[in-house]
């Protein structure tokens, strides 16, 4: 974390579902990462980032596994921020607010952001390991792909590397790895409010999910959203 923070003029962090694995607490994450809170706002030369924590408990539809929810305290805070901030605003969360693998109260969150669509220029998330863009109630949502793999689970266990590698890192057999790391650079034009995305292209190591018979979700296509890439994009604001 120190190396990451030291490598950037300003480093911001968002809590994901795996960050509290192995008994780690959110308080430890906040302390070690230097976060001001588990959800917070940050102004960067007029661009206002609203960073959220999608790991609240209390979802009435939670059926086990990792929580994926925004509780009443946080949604109340979000509404207040959206009302008080002038914009432009980018929403940042680990769990998706729309589309595949969205939080349990996705419709509620989409309604909250939709009410502030004149200020919210983009909402970005990780978690889903796909490359997808949606537009709902005037707000654009982008799933930023995983850095390194697509999870396929134990049913589709297979070897993409040498037996020595799989013996040392057994969980790799539950994934379809990317040959190169993926990341994206976002740029913002304060005059036009356009957001540019410079992504990365890679390829599968070993078999692709489609070759294994993986059908991740009816809404997703292999070679489309399910692919080892983050596409270059430009998001333009609709003139009013």
Whereabouts are the PLM-identified features?
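Alpha-helix N-cap/helix-start capping motif
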Residues: 103, 127-128
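Short acidic, glycine-rich surface-loop motifs adjacent to enzyme active sites
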Residues: 80-100
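A short C-terminal boundary segment appended to hydrolase-like catalytic domains
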Residues: 165-240
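Extended active-site neighborhood of metal-dependent phosphoesterases/phosphodiesterases
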Residues: 1-79, 83-84, 108-121, 130-188
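Active-site glycine-centered loops adjacent to acidic/histidine catalytic or metal-binding residues
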Residues: 16-17, 94, 126-127
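Structural motif
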Residues: 49-51, 90-92, 124
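Acidic-and-aromatic substrate-binding clefts and catalytic sites of carbohydrate-active enzymes
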Residues: 19-23, 98-103
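Short acidic, gly/pro-rich beta-turn/loop elements at beta-sheet edges
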Residues: 60-62, 101, 151, 196, ...
């Amino acid at each position: 974390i120190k190396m990451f923070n030291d490598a950037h003029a300003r480093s911001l962090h968002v809590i994901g579902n795996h960050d509290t694995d192995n008994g780690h607490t959110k308080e430890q994450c906040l302390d070690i990462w230097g976060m001001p809170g588990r959800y917070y706002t940050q102004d960067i030369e007029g661009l206002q980032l609203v960073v959220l924590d999608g790991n609240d408990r209390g979802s009435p539809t939670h059926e086990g596994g990792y929580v994926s929810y925004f509780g009443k305290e946080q949604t109340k805070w979000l509404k207040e921020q959206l009302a008080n901030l002038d914009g432009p605003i980018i929403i940042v969360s680990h769990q998706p607010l729309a589309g595949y693998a969205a939080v349990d109260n996705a419709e509620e969150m989409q309604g909250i952001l939709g009410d502030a669509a004149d200020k919210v220029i983009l909402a970005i998330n990780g978690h889903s390991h796909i490359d997808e863009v949606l537009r709902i109630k005037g707000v654009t949502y982008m799933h930023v792909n995983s850095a390194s793999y697509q999870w396929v689970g134990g049913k589709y266990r297979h070897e993409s590397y040498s037996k020595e590698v799989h013996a040392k890192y057994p969980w790799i057999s539950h994934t379809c790895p990317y040959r190169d790391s993926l990341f994206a650079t976002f740029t913002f034009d304060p005059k036009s409010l356009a957001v540019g995305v410079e992504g990365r292209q890679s390829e599968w190591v070993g078999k692709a999910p489609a070759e294994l018979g993986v059908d991740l979700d009816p809404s997703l296509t292999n070679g489309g959203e399910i692919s080892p890439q983050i596409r270059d994009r430009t998001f333009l604001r609709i003139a009013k």
